[in-house]
């Protein structure tokens, strides 16, 4: 099990967010502090004229498709905005930005401001993690040193008052040691605290600054704000933030409730869902059939007594309650709900819901049967997920999050029959015992045994009152939930159910939350996106690597009072995206966008159509204000609107499935079973010497890949210029690079041998042979091993069939179940439509010979194959589901083709075709890796053809499937 998350470098959507901020500072100059005594303690000043600042922002906005309007920029503001949807990696993005600002301009002191303690805990854990240090160390040779502002305990009888320790250490930290970037993390509560708003006897920076605000302002910090909607301008918190005297404030969030200052990047919710950067969402809505149409309204209060009006079955009844009374007095369905506080216009219920006069609740949403049903359903679905994910390789550990208001029933319910905890454990035990009876997977069976043996170990909770609790067991739970994601995700740890009372609603998340169950309504106006945000991130596997090769879904359970949850969420997702900018001219970019989806249109034909339909004029300008709209209507596939269908849906909508034309499967059966045989790739390398030669060639061709481990001397010189002391760094030409290896040669060979499965002797001989070109003893580090592994895998792929040949061994054995068949080999009635394609065409029926009743596809070329031009000789054809057939290729990669065809010739013979679609003009447009993978597929099907004839063909954008098949017929 990995000890930390594996971060991915240069994910396009995160890199774009980093680049957007960095490009704001193009042409900026860095100026050192004039005061020599504190120069190494403060940031250099980044200078940029207002004109250049405006020019940079405008250019960045144009690059990122952001409308350059007054609401999106203010050249007089030092606030820069980066909008990224929940779950897409805001924290990573701003952390990488910190490293880049340090690398480019020497900015060394940053303040990260977060709204809540839970966000602060998550941020600090992220910044301090060993995995993050390792991830950035290769590229930046720096690491972040984190300072956390906590509430300060009474200093006792000391006669002098001292600045809070974290602030003292941060302000006084010297930039002389270039190893560190200094980051102070502070939450809203601390900004308002007495600790920050006091003056102290012992000041900072040579005792010039005796208050935290003045001392922090003196270091000229860059400020990062997380969740900007929690920091409205004009309010007290923002006034205090301005006291930090930041050079620039960079705000990162999904919600900007007051609008933007200088918006430079936006990754919308639509982008996140459509590009599969987050999970899709299924909402499980618990409906009450029959009764349930009741309304309990707060109608008045005198500050001592509250009046509620119950309206049920057209009958109205008044109830008077005082503080502490139970609302069960008003309706029999209500349990565990009391009146906690009351004023003349507002009351607060024990579950945290605040009601103003005129507001109401539905009593049935507090019915115990409803809550029990939701909990049972969530537990049952959890175990279904768990069985699927923990019996595959690599394994994924799913988590389920329950939001509750019955804290006593959970925390104190151990020995109380019928308590929330007792019922939960009863339901979990029942499911686990049932699964144990039939489970054959050894690992999962043992995992279930642990569950049954110690049921209390499978769940944990975090509630705000826990912060003052001294119970060791509770403290352990909180540490796992709040601070140690890796421990929570460990397969050695049976805890996978988490309970909270909305304390975790914002600022906390875990990538492996696959279910969120709201056993009580939150009573909050928080956006639906914020609510589901706890589980939107893509999951990680047992090795802490993000899994992105398939579609995942977050299951969200709500009661009938939120029956419009999905509609509201979809509306919010689409409304949160940009209003589209309407261009005035038909550009080359638009032309390419249309032709990518309609490749049958030549450039000339497209332009002629647009001119004839009076969409554009002779100069390619749109003819009128409606022309762009007509263009989108004419070519809809090129202009997708909003979030894709099915990304957010009710669970009752079912998983998207499409019906198979089962009668046709018998005609495809032989080919389907043939291509589902397992195959093992065989490298036809005749001797160890031949392999040695290949590995040696790789090392000689890829010498620039490797980075030496070592130390060199940098000389910082202080000199006088115009009566002012200055410094500059010099690297001497005579500097001897001091080798500093992180492992011995033997350790390096052992590690490399195990990583790339090559004998020690072979590696040693190669390194001896090439020592005059590259002396491997200067590169003995883990980065070299990683680069050899990734580089050699790609080298094997790119040089297959050239420097060595290969073949395939087919493994006999049962191939069922498959994506099309059950364990007995019988065809399924329906399959997941997402396995066939993410796009759907409802306007056309599939061809009669197609295996399925609906049209799902991934490209326009695929759609044409499925819907256009029936081919008389084709008996049956089908899309090959994603990841159902994985052809092994050199270097450890795999390859999956797109279509299977069975054709009957005029002579009555049957021919089989496997088609790979490539939406490019020709083979010349393919990357080398794609060409090589196609060669591998060709080799496999050539071998299969020795027993049953199978033709493998590649279809390019301009290829008609009819002509492609016809050309191969005898």
Curated annotation (Swiss-Prot):
Protein's UniProt keywords contain ATP-binding: yes
Cofactor requirements of the protein: Mg(2+); S-adenosyl-L-methionine
InterPro entries per record: Helicase/UvrB_N, P-loop_NTPase, RE_endonuc_C
Region spans: Endonuclease domain: 894-918
Top EC group: hydrolase
Residue numbers spanned by region Helicase-like domain: 75-540
EC number in record: 3.1.21.5
Result when mutating residue 534 to A: No DNA restriction, no ATPase activity, forms wild-type complex with Mod
Catalytic activity: Endonucleolytic cleavage of DNA to give specific double-stranded fragments with terminal 5'-phosphates
Pfam families documented for this protein: RE_endonuc, ResIII
Any one GO molecular function term: type III site-specific deoxyribonuclease activity
One biological process term in Gene Ontology: DNA restriction-modification system
Keyword DNA-binding: yes
Function description: A type III restriction enzyme that recognizes 2 inversely oriented double-stranded sequences 5'-AGACC-3' and cleaves DNA 25-27 base pairs downstream of one site, producing a single-strand 5' protrusion of two nucleotides. DNA restriction requires both the Res and Mod subunits. DNA topology affects its action; relaxed and negatively supercoiled DNA are digested but positively supercoiled DNA is not a good substrate.
Family membership noted in the UniProt record: Belongs to the type III restriction-modification system Res protein family.
Known partners and oligomeric status: A heterotetramer with stoichiometry Res(2)Mod(2).
NCBIfam families registered for this protein in UniProt: PRK15483.1
Entry text on domains: Has a helicase-type domain in its N-terminus and an endonuclease-type domain in its C-terminus; ATP and DNA hydrolysis activities are mediated by the N- and C-terminal domains respectively. The C-terminus is probably required for interaction with the Mod subunit; deletion of residues 897-970 is unstable as is this protein when expressed alone.
Misc. remarks from the entry: This R-M system is also known as EcoP1 and EcoP1I.
Protein name listed in UniProt: Type III restriction-modification enzyme EcoPI Res subunit
Organism: Escherichia phage P1 (Bacteriophage P1)
């Amino acid at each position: 099990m990995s000890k930390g998350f594996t971060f991915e470098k240069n994910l396009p959507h995160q890199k774009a967010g980093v680049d957007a901020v960095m490009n704001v500072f193009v042409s900026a100059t860095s100026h050192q502090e004039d005061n020599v005594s504190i120069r190494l303690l403060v940031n250099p000043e980044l200078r940029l004229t207002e004109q250049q600042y405006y020019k940079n922002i405008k250019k960045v906005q144009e690059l990122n498709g952001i409308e350059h309007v007054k609401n999106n920029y203010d050249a007089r503001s030092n606030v820069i905005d980066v909008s990224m949807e929940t779950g897409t990696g805001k924290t990573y993005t701003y952390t990488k930005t910190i490293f880049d600002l340090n690398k480019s301009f020497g900015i060394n002191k940053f303040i990260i401001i977060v709204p809540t303690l839970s966000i602060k805990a998550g941020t600090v854990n992220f910044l301090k993690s060993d995995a993050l240090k390792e991830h950035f160390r290769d590229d930046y040779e720096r690491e972040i040193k984190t300072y956390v502002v906590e509430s300060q305990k009474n200093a006792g009888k000391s006669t002098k008052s001292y600045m809070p320790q974290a602030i003292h250490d941060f302000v006084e930290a010297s930039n002389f040691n270039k190893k560190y970037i200094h980051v102070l993390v502070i939450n809203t509560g601390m900004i308002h605290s007495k600790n920050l708003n006091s003056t102290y006897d012992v000041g900072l920076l040579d005792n010039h600054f005796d208050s935290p605000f003045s001392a922090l302002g003196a270091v000229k910090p860059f400020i990062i704000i997380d969740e900007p909607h929690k920091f409205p301008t004009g309010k007290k918190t923002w006034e205090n933030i301005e006291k930090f005297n930041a050079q620039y404030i960079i705000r990162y969030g999904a919600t900007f409730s007051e609008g933007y200052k200088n918006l430079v990047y936006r990754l919308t919710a639509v982008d996140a869902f459509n590009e599969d950067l987050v999970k899709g969402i299924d909402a499980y809505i618990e409906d009450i059939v029959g009764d349930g149409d009741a309304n309990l309204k707060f109608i008045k209060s005198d500050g001592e007594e509250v009046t509620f009006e119950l309206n049920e079955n057209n009958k109205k009844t008044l109830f008077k309650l005082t503080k502490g009374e139970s609302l069960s007095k008003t309706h029999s369905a209500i349990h565990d709900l009391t009146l906690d506080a009351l004023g003349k216009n507002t009351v607060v219920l024990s579950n945290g819901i605040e009601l103003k006069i005129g507001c109401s609740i539905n009593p049935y949403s507090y019915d115990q049967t409803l809550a029990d049903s939701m909990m049972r359903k969530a537990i049952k679905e959890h175990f279904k997920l768990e069985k699927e994910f923990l019996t595959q390789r690599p394994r994924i550990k799913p988590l389920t999050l329950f939001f509750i208001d019955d804290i006593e029933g959970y925390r104190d319910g151990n020995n109380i029959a019928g308590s929330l905890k007792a019922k939960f454990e009863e339901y979990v035990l029942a499911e686990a015992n049932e699964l144990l009876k039939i489970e054959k997977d050894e690992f999962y069976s043992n995992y279930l045994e642990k569950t049954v043996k110690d049921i209390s170990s499978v769940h944990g909770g975090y509630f705000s009152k826990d912060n003052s609790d001294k119970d060791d067991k509770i403290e352990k739970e909180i540490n796992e939930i709040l601070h140690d994601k890796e421990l929570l995700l460990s397969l050695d740890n049976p805890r996978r159910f988490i309970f909270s009372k909305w304390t975790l609603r914002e600022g906390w998340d875990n990538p492996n939350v696959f279910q969120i169950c709201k056993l009580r309504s939150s009573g909050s106006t928080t956006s639906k996106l914020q609510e589901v945000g706890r589980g939107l991130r893509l999951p990680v596997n047992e090795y802490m690597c993000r899994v992105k090769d398939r579609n995942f879904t977050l299951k969200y359970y709500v009661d009938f009072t939120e029956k419009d949850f999905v509609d509201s969420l979809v509306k919010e997702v689409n409304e949160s995206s940009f209003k589209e900018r309407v261009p005035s001219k038909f550009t080359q970019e638009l032309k390419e966008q249309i032709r990518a989806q309609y490749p049958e249109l030549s450039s000339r034909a497209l332009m002629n159509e647009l001119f004839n339909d009076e969409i554009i004029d002779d100069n390619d300008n749109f003819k009128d204000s409606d022309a762009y709209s007509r263009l989108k209507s004419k070519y809809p596939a090129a202009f997708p609107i909003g979030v894709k269908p099915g990304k957010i849906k009710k669970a009752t909508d079912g998983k998207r499935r499409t019906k198979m034309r089962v009668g046709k499967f018998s005609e495809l059966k032989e080919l389907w079973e043939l291509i589902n045989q397992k195959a093992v790739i065989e490298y036809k390398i005749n001797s160890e010497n031949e392999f040695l030669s290949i590995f040696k060639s790789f090392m000689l061709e890829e010498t620039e890949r490797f980075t030496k481990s070592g130390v060199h001397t940098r000389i910082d010189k202080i000199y006088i210029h115009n009566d002012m002391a200055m410094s500059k760094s010099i690297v001497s030409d005579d500097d001897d690079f001091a080798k500093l290896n992180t492992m011995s040669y033997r350790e390096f060979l052992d590690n490399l041998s195990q990583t790339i499965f090559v004998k020690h002797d072979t590696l040693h001989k190669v390194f001896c042979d090439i020592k005059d070109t590259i002396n491997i003893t200067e590169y003995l580090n883990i980065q070299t091993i990683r680069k050899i592994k990734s580089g050699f895998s790609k080298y094997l792929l790119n040089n297959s069939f050239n420097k060595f040949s290969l073949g395939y061994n087919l493994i006999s054995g049962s191939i069922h179940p498959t994506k099309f068949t059950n364990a007995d080999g019988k065809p399924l009635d329906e399959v997941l439509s997402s396995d066939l394609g993410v796009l759907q065409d409802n306007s056309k029926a599939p061809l009669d010979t197609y295996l399925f009743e609906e049209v799902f596809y991934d490209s326009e070329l695929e759609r044409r194959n499925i819907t256009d031009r029936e081919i008389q000789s084709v008996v049956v054809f089908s899309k090959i589901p994603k990841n159902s057939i994985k052809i092994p290729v050199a270097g450890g990669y795999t390859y999956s083709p797109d279509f299977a065809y069975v054709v009957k010739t005029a002579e009555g013979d049957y021919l089989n075709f496997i088609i790979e679609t490539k939406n490019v003009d020709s083979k010349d447009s393919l990357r080398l890796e794609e060409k090589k993978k196609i060669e591998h597929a060709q080799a496999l099907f050539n071998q299969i053809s020795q027993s049953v004839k199978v033709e493998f063909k590649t279809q390019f954008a301009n290829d008609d499937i009819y002509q492609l098949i016809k050309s191969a017929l005898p």
